[in-house]
Regions:
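Active-site cradle of extracellular carbohydrate-active enzymes
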Residues: 156, 160-163, 175-290, 586-608, ...
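Aromatic (Trp/Tyr) and acidic
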Residues: 80-83, 87-114, 171, 306, ...
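Short linear capping/connector segments at secondary-structure termini
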Residues: 161-170, 280, 427-434, 473, ...
Length: 767
């Protein structure tokens, strides 16, 4: 009580709580200064699109409904109780009956939707004015405010006497529960506070609006409906208090504000939240999770209102208990929730994630809320939440940039598929003339786009990316029978394997296993390796094995993990051991190709196919080696694999001609350095491997993360194209096959794939 008294006195004495009610003005100022950053840019441009749409709308008004309240005054707000429907046993359907959790579409014909449209438009326009300083947005917002609240011919009477009526009951008068309809005014007033600095919103407008809300506040405090709502024991009472405090804040009624704040913990929180965090009144509903989150969100709103006072209300520990009770079900299926939730599970899960993020802003000691929110929140960057509350990190910005590019690329791909009449064509790189190079599903690069789309879904949780990933993944299914390719790991694990990891769906698992069976047919135990290319004359090579093939072993390791059949694992280990024995030089660098005598497995020669010369250091090949042996250690914990990965890393970063940004030249022995082409794909592969390697090597973890962080940062800052260019690829400056004069200094899809994987692993390493 002493702490509450202090808070009340503090608020009363200083009389200077900031003008904003829930929004944080310093945060908005920070956003305004960084609108060029990808996350904010996407949210901002969507906001402006909505504001432009609002400019074209006529101001909503209560006078537009085609039905009048029982009072006979069309200025009286009128809405239907959401869950009440006509009684099918009565000829006239009266009185309506309750179907809890089922919304009656009739409510759309009255004032509720118009109130929502108006408050949303005012908030949108106010934010658009704040971020752009363009008076047209403020003028439209003020027009809507005047129409709804001030102009005599169109204004709403300051009451909710006919809110949420139940036709056929109580003379069609409103119910106390109807006061929840006006909760939308709370956030709208944040927009109003922003408009106070505009030219359009005059001092008379401010005076008139405050007069309206003073009368509305008085009605809430003295009317039968208001008093009954105040006596409720669930989210309605919470929402009632938040509204009273917000309107008192706006109108300068300190007495009411202080009184309600001083009683809130005792009257609302202690009566609604059990010691273990359960909210019994909400848990009895058919939408128990949703209403529990709804009430929690209202309480957080109140804590944000008082945040600007520099104090905290006493109830934070109990509020956190309520959050903790719900948070344990984030990421789980609805059937794991022990109460009812007949619909809207995913939406309410996301709403809770946003609430947890706001709770973290109120108490930075609860970093677990931040981690949980960032792990599960749907990153639909157009969501206003990302403008009003979210503080994005570098990974958020990188994925937001990737979203812009990949949406653009999917448009380009779809157009070309129609032109070429082949729905299975996949994007690989950019041609010399700037056009998009498309390849068939048999190309070793065909699976990377699907993998990128799955990683976009993994990070954002946006269903759009899952839909795109599913569609593009199944186009590759026939590859599971493709015994002519050693690259089934690239083609099928980076698509179907990632899909199975993220979804657990049996259909993806089945394809992965068949692809592994097919890949295993390319293994010859006399050589101890999986054969790479099937093409090539005997004078060129008899049984070529390339370092790239290390990457395909993941498919085999996974097949054994999923089935318990050691056959695939044994092949992978044999291949890794033989490659480790024959592919590496004493300094830890690797050859590109080793040619074997197929009859006895003896080495015929060590050469290159994509490097500058046989003894050169082809950069992407070193990346395959580092990544491949790190991955092998993950599955086997064989220290020899860890040692090989370390040794190649040590060699790699000892290169005297390594650029300062750690994005290598395509071949580190090219005499044209520093004018030689770079290879961003090699950098992305190595960075991704380093994040994983750091988790296995405590001694060098800090060094490996330092290297990986630097590479990731430089790829983000200096190797990305302008949005809507480069055919939608994410990275510039990769090199495919320099000796063949093909794909030199261009965007390539595998660079993008390992770049996104790098970002995901970086985010995980921070946790």
């Amino acid at each position: 009580m002493r702490k509450l008294l202090f808070i009340t006195l503090f608020i009363t004495i200083v009389g200077g709580v900031q003008a904003q009610i829930i929004w944080d003005k310093p945060h908005l100022a920070e956003v305004k200064a960084h609108l060029h950053q990808p996350v904010y840019s996407m949210a901002y441009h969507h906001l402006i699109d909505e504001a432009e749409e609002a400019l074209r709308q006529s101001p909503p008004t209560v006078m537009q409904k085609n039905k009048v309240a029982a009072s006979g005054d069309k200025h009286d707000y009128l809405s239907l109780s959401r869950y009440f429907w006509p009684d099918p046993t009565k000829s006239d359907g009266l009185p309506y009956i309750n179907r809890d959790g089922m919304s009656n579409p009739e409510l759309e014909r009255l004032d509720r939707n118009r109130l929502s449209e108006m408050t949303s438009a005012v908030s949108t326009l106010a934010l658009a004015w704040y971020f752009t300083n363009e008076e047209k947005y403020a003028s439209k917002a003020v027009e809507m405010i005047r129409t709804w609240f001030i102009n005599k011919g169109t204004r709403m009477n300051p009451n909710m006497n006919y809110a949420q009526i139940v036709p056929g009951q109580n003379g069609d008068k409103g119910r106390c529960y109807g006061l929840i309809d006006s909760y939308a005014f709370v956030e709208m007033l944040d927009g109003v506070q922003l408009l106070a600095s505009s030219k359009a919103f005059t001092s008379q407008d401010q005076k008139d609006l405050k007069t309206w809300f003073s009368r509305f506040l008085e009605w809430m405090l003295t009317s039968d409906q208001g008093r009954e709502e105040a006596r409720q024991l669930n989210n309605h009472a919470t929402a009632y208090d938040v509204q009273v405090i917000a309107y008192a804040h706006f109108t300068g009624n300190r007495k009411v504000m202080d009184e309600r704040l001083s009683q809130f913990y005792r009257k609302r929180m202690l009566t609604q939240i059990e010691a273990d965090g359960r909210q019994p009144q909400e848990l009895r509903r058919t939408l128990a999770f949703g209403y529990s989150q709804y009430n929690l969100s209202h309480i957080i709103d109140l804590f944000q209102i008082v945040r600007h006072s520099g104090c905290e209300l006493e109830g934070m520990p109990l509020l956190q208990k309520a959050a903790d009770f719900l948070a344990r079900y984030i990421g789980k299926r609805v059937d794991e929730w022990p109460y009812q939730q007949i619909n809207g599970w995913d939406e309410k899960q996301n709403a809770l994630c946003q609430d947890l993020y706001r709770l973290y802003l109120l108490d930075n000691d609860r970093a677990d809320y931040l981690r949980l929110a960032k792990k599960h929140v749907v990153r639909h960057w157009n969501d206003r939440f990302f403008l009003l509350y979210y503080v994005p990190d570098a990974t958020d910005h990188a994925f937001a940039q990737a979203e812009v590019q990949l949406r653009y690329q999917l448009q380009q791909v779809d157009s070309l598929r129609k032109v070429q009449n082949d729905r299975c064509m996949m994007p690989r790189s950019v041609e010399k003339d700037g056009s998009l190079r498309m390849v068939g599903i048999g190309d070793w690069c065909s699976g990377f786009l699907s993998g990128e789309l799955w990683m976009m879904y993994q990070f954002t949780h946006d269903p759009y990316w899952r839909e795109q990933a599913v569609t593009n993944t199944w186009r590759l299914e026939d590859n599971k029978w493709n015994g002519s390719s050693h690259d089934l790991g690239f083609m099928m694990y980076d698509s179907f394997g990632v899909a199975y990891r993220l979804t657990g769906e049996q259909s993806y698992r089945d394809v992965v296993l068949q692809a592994a069976r097919t890949l295993a047919t390319r293994y010859d135990e006399r050589v101890g390796c999986i054969r790479s290319w099937s093409w090539g004359t005997p004078d060129r090579w008899k049984y070529a094995v390339i370092i790239d093939n290390m990457m395909n072993l993941e498919l085999l390791f996974e097949a054994s993990r999923l089935t318990g059949d050691e056959h695939y694992r044994n092949i992978a280990i044999s291949h890794a051991n033989t490659t480790m024995k024959n592919h590496f030089r004493a300094d830890g660098s690797c050859y590109h190709v080793v040619d074997y005598e197929p009859d006895d497995g003896s080495v015929i020669k060590r050469i290159t196919h994509q490097g500058l010369f046989d003894e050169s250091v082809w950069s992407r090949g070193q990346g395959w080696a580092i990544y491949g042996y790190t991955m092998c250690y993950r599955y086997t914990h064989d220290p020899a694999y860890l040692d090989q990965a370390r040794k190649t890393v040590d060699f790699w970063f000892s290169q005297e001609q390594m650029p300062d940004d750690l994005i290598p030249y395509w071949d580190m022995r090219d005499p044209a350095i520093p004018s030689a082409p770079r290879d961003a794909s090699a950098a992305a592969i190595i960075a991704s491997a380093l994040y994983e390697l750091a988790s296995y090597d405590e001694e060098k973890a800090e060094l490996y993360r330092k290297y990986a962080d630097k590479i990731a940062h430089n790829l983000e800052s200096s190797y990305q194209p302008m949005p809507g260019t480069a055919q939608g690829f994410l990275l510039l400056h990769s090199t495919g096959n320099y000796p063949a004069r093909d794909e030199i200094d261009v965007p390539i899809n595998y660079a993008d794939y390992y770049y996104l994987e790098t970002l995901l692993r970086r985010a995980e390493s921070v946790k």
